[in-house]
Amino acid sequence: MADFLKGLPVYNESNFSRFHADSVCKASNRRPSVYLPTREYPSDQIIVTEKTNILLRYLHQQWDKKNAAKKRDQDQLEIGETSAPPRKIARTDSQEMSEDT
């Protein structure tokens, strides 16, 4: 088993030559950072978390934003702007493509 562990960095004493136990103690003497609120909130305020998953909520919001334009276009068509030509035009080369395959 010694041959298996031979040459690993753990056996190299110079890896720990810059480590000083005193420096660890000095770092722990620093004061921890503390949050100081900038506004006063009522003490009887109750914070309630939402039941839905954050990812699901985000995806629903993105879907709503994406489909808002489609919904708006559909509403305009229902109002009476049906005389406007459609934005999409049928492909004329679709028959040629099916014949090639």
UniProtKB/Swiss-Prot annotation:
This is DET1- and DDB1-associated protein 1. Pathway: Protein modification; protein ubiquitination. PANTHER family: DET1- AND DDB1-ASSOCIATED PROTEIN 1 (PTHR31879:SF2). Keywords: Ubl conjugation pathway. InterPro entries: DDA1-like (IPR033575), DDA1_dom (IPR018276). The lineage of its organism: Eukaryota, Metazoa, Chordata, Craniata, Vertebrata. Functions as a component of numerous distinct DCX (DDB1-CUL4-X-box) E3 ubiquitin-protein ligase complexes which mediate the ubiquitination and subsequent proteasomal degradation of target proteins. In the DCX complexes, acts as a scaffolding subunit required to stabilize the complex. Component of numerous DCX (DDB1-CUL4-X-box) E3 ubiquitin-protein ligase complexes which consist of a core of DDB1, cullin-4 (CUL4A or CUL4B), DDA1 and RBX1.
